């Protein structure tokens, strides 16, 4: 494997992101993906078990860090030109036979877990400053093998390199620090991701057994230290954030750890309203409506492994000859399996697989609107989030050159401007229906308009109307895409921010189609 190198004397936000991309590529190649997110290899041969990367300080002091490819932890390191190497207390035995074998191998008196490193450093991650200068000092401290400073220095390096490789949110936090030459303290948003990577990976893998639902809730935080309880893959802070997963299990092998048989949650959609059994009526044929989200029992939906979705003891059902295009609840035993079977797509479309071209729809964005089955046009009126956290996710959307999407021209247009913390025009609300709304005025939606640039639709801001040119999906490849089969991606026109044009374009994965939700 070719090593990834980061030389701080030449580093900027761009070279840092290239370095992180290189690490991800090496660890995530030749493996399978779930929802587009690579799962780390496991059961590797000894010769393929470790990956080396080189970090060089501004003073030209280099260290080689050895990473366990199976679980992405630091195992050992060697200062350049030294006959000494240093292994974590919990390094696997095979590491000593494989790594730095021509050196004197020292064993450190702490292991590579955050808990052990924090204890040895006598502090916590949230008090340790991250940024270019702290990384420079950390590399230098490891190069000089100063025992008192090693735990602290590892906490800096592990977060800025390994944790950033796992999560786009952490990578972007570090990229900002390179761009602005400012340091930052890891907040709960960062620490909650770091502490939950293994659990998030397990739940993503388990979710394939039950419509994208997790077997248990993962507690994450946003940058305002507000709790976001995530219980499915249908959140951009999961799907478009996790860059690598730790291998736990494969559902196809019948592994219990990875099996979710039932899960009860809410379904939110248009204008962040919830799917509700009207009046909590339990009689067969009771209709489904949109209603303000609450904790009432008639908004609780239990997903079963047989494809049924149930509330109040009855099955979510559709049958043209019985109910017209209405969606109702009905006694599960009295209907054919094809009337009560449902699929949820990654993009948030809910369909009955036996009615291939129809999708669950809310034709109006008002409370008590009847839910119906309509021809699937991938419109925002057909976008849903299966999950208990129903509020919009608020954040900035970071694109080319670490610049932020900004609502401009009196909230009628949008393009990239330099990111400014807490600037209202750069704050967006991501709704359950797939709309991206101006946080300041949530009647306004990011829209692929009819005006064109170079034959491609220009993306502007218009009143929300539930149409298919206002629905977006944040994907694992870093794109913000339309949800239909003819997928198009949000694109900075010609990679030129000065054109002030954001357009729809065929997906190609270049930097001008890469976006990070900074929430």
Curated annotation (Swiss-Prot):
The 2-beta repeat ranges on this chain: 442-482
Domain Ricin B-type lectin: 261-387, 390-518
Binding site for a carbohydrate: 276-279, 296-298, 454, 491-494, 505-508, 512
Molecular function GO labels: carbohydrate binding; rRNA N-glycosylase activity
The 2-alpha repeat ranges on this chain: 401-438
Glycosylated residues in this chain: 370
Keyword entries, A-Z: Disulfide bond, Glycoprotein, Lectin, Repeat
Matches recorded under InterPro entries: Ribosome-inact_prot_sf, Ribosome_inactivat_1/2, Ribosome_inactivat_prot, Ribosome_inactivat_prot_sub1, Ribosome_inactivat_prot_sub2, Ricin_B-like_lectins, Ricin_B_lectin
Keyword Disulfide bond set for record: yes
Chain positions of 1-alpha repeats: 271-311
2-gamma repeats, residue ranges: 486-513
SUPFAM superfamilies, sorted: Ribosome inactivating proteins (RIP) (SSF56371), Ricin B-like lectins (SSF50370)
Function noted in UniProt: Seed lectin similar to type 2 ribosome-inactivating proteins. The Aalpha and Abeta chains constitute the rRNA glycosidase domain and the B chain the carbohydrate-binding lectin domain. Is predicted to have no glycosidase activity and, hence, to be non-toxic, due to small changes in both the nucleotide binding and carbohydrate binding capabilities. Binds galactose and derivatives with a preference for the beta-anomeric forms. Binds prophyrins. Has hemagglutinating activity towards rabbit and human erythrocytes.
Domain notes for this protein: The B chain is composed of two domains with each domain consisting of 3 homologous subdomains (alpha, beta, gamma).
Protein name: Seed lectin
Source organism per UniProt: Trichosanthes anguina
């Amino acid at each position: 494997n070719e090593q990834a190198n980061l030389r701080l004397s030449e580093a900027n936000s761009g070279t840092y992101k290239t370095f992180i991309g290189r690490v991800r590529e090496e660890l995530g190649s030749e493996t399978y993906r779930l929802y587009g997110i690579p799962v780390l290899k496991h059961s590797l041969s000894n010769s393929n078990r470790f990956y080396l990367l080189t970090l060089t300080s501004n003073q030209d002091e280099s260290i080689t860090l050895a990473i366990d490819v199976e679980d992405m932890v630091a195992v050992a390191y060697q200062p350049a030109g030294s006959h000494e190497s240093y292994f974590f207390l919990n390094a696997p035995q095979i590491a000593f036979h494989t790594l730095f074998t021509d050196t004197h191998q020292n064993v450190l008196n702490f292991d590579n877990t955050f808990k052990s490193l924090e204890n040895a450093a006598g502090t916590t991650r949230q008090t340790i400053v991250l940024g270019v200068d702290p990384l420079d000092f950390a590399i230098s401290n490891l190069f000089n093998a100063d025992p008192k400073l090693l735990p602290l220095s590892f906490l800096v390096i592990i977060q800025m390199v390994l944790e950033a490789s796992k999560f786009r949110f952490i990578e972007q936090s570090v990229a900002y620090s390179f761009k602005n030459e400012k340091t930052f303290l890891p907040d709960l948003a960062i620490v909650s991701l770091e502490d939950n990577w293994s659990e998030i990976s397990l739940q993503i893998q388990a979710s394939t057994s039950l419509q994208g639902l997790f077997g248990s809730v993962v507690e994450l935080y946003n940058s305002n230290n507000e709790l976001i309880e995530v219980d499915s893959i249908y959140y951009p802070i999961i799907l478009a954030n996790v860059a690598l997963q730790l291998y736990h299990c494969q559902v196809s092998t019948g592994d219990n750890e990875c099996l979710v048989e039932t899960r009860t949650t809410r379904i939110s959609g248009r204008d962040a309203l919830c799917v509700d059994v009207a009046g909590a009526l339990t009689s067969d044929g009771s209709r489904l409506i949109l209603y303000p989200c609450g904790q009432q029992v008639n908004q609780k939906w239990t997903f079963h492994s047989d494809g049924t979705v149930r509330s109040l003891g009855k099955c979510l059902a559709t049958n043209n000859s019985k109910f017209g295009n209405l969606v109702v609840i009905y006694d599960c035993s009295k209907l054919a399996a094809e009337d009560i079977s449902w699929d949820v797509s990654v993009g948030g479309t809910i369909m009955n697989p036996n009615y291939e071209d129809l999708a669950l729809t809310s034709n109006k964005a008002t409370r008590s609107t009847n839910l119906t089955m309509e021809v699937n046009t991938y419109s925002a009126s057909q976008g849903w989030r299966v999950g208990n956290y129903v509020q919009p996710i608020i954040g900035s959307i970071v694109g080319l050159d670490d610049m932020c999407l900004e609502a401009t021209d009196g909230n009628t247009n949008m393009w990239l401007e330099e990111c400014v913390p807490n600037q209202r025009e750069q704050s967006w609300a991501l709704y359950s229906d797939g709309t991206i709304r101006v946080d300041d005025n949530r009647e306004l939606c990011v829209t692929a308009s009819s005006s064109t640039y170079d034959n491609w639709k220009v993306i502007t801001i218009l009143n929300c109307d539930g149409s298919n040119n206002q629905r977006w999906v944040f994907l694992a490849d870093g794109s913000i895409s339309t949800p239909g089969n003819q997928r198009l991606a949000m694109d900075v026109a010609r990679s030129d921010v000065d054109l002030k044009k954001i357009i729809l374009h065929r997906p190609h994965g270049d930097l001008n189609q890469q976006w990070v939700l900074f929430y």
